From Swiss-Prot:
Residues 91-205 are annotated as: Disordered. It comes from Mus musculus. Residues 98-108 have a biased composition (Basic and acidic residues). This is Dr1-associated corepressor. The keyword Iron-sulfur does not apply.
Length: 205
């Protein structure tokens, strides 16, 4: 049986591209082939950007591509000059041992982000959900920058968590100990006499 070549069919959605194009008032009708061609051009552009960024990452002996690697790639390649504004706020790479430093820097940042420490019981878990719902990467970057700077501002939010009702702990049940008093008990009152019992029977009948 001959082996079938699997057709590479992953593309940027042409309908979305057409919608973006039509937001420009100067563009009227768009031929069906145009968004498809732009979709393929986007793929080729991303492929070249990621290959260059991958080379930068590997040259640093890093296992994870970071925004700093992308920034260096964009600054080194003249064809990516138009992207420099996007990465202007990204921190520069540090020396050859940068992988260890960057990973070390990320650890404490994660610790300061809301909802990541063990003491907070998901009080700010909704922020993580909001990130998934945001539409563009730039919105996500803005939100991530906000969460980085809000780390110090999050500490005043501890008192609302203290407003939860305090936990009530029950102590283990104590064994029954019969009461023994050092004082003598008074004599028991006399019980009902036989005559009283007969009177009570009369009332019952």
């Amino acid at each position: 049986m001959p082996s079938k070549k699997k057709k590479y069919n992953a593309r940027f959605p042409p309908a979305r591209i057409k919608k973006i194009m039509q937001t420009d008032e100067e563009i009227g009708k768009v031929a069906a082939a145009v968004p498809v061609i732009i979709s393929r051009a986007l793929e080729l552009f991303l492929e070249s950007l990621l290959k260059k960024a991958c080379q930068v990452t590997q040259s640093r002996n890093a296992k994870t591509m970071t925004t700093s690697h992308l920034k260096q790639c964009i600054e080194l390649e003249q064809q990516f000059d138009f992207l420099k504004d996007l990465v202007a706020s990204v921190p520069d790479m540090q020396g050859d041992g940068e992988d260890n430093h960057v990973d070390g820097d990320k650890g404490p940042r994660r610790g300061r982000k809301p909802g990541s420490s063990g003491r907070k019981n998901g009080g700010t878990g909704s922020k993580g959900k909001d990130k998934k719902l945001s539409g563009t990467d730039s919105e996500q970057e803005d939100e991530s920058e906000d969460t980085d700077t809000d780390g110090e501002e999050e500490t005043p939010q501890l008192p609302p968590q203290a407003s939860h009702p305090p936990a009530h702990f029950q102590s283990p049940p104590t064994p029954f100990i019969p009461f023994t008093s050092p004082l003598p008990l008074p004599p028991a009152p006399p019980g009902p006499s036989a005559a009283d019992a007969e009177d009570e029977e009369d009332y019952d009948s």
